[in-house]
Amino acid sequence: MISKAVYLLSDVAKWPERLRSEPGVYEIVALDRAGRPKAMRRAGGVDKRGVLYIGQGKIRDRLRKLSRGLFQGTKGHIAGRAYLARPAIQAVAPMRDLAFRFEHCDDPEKREKLRLNRYIRKFGEVPPLNAQRRLLI
């Protein structure tokens, strides 16, 4: 199960020790000013978890690539490029409020697909920074 705890993308020094460069799935989420997941309107309802992206891979490596892309302007993670290309998303989810939650697992591709499909069934669309992906249903 993916963690309920969230960690700011910008605060690498406070990323948890258990976040390793091992396979797993992660979600990029928007936080409100109080540091809680920000409710986001979707086609099929309100996403109270504030999910912007669902991804998989060697988690620490993927998140470092995303963090560098966002905060240092380097190329790399597709979610970072999608975020920087969409001012409307930046307006509702400022960079300072981007965070992640994660889980290590043995079959991250399968787990990612499962999480995306659940999201699509619930909200009628993929998370906004996953929009470049083909539908997985």
Which functions belong to the PLM regions below?
Residues 1-65, 96-114, 133-137:
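GIY-YIG nuclease catalytic motif and its immediate N-terminal context
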Residues 82, 130, 134-135:
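A sequence-level detector of short, solvent-exposed, charge-rich linear segments
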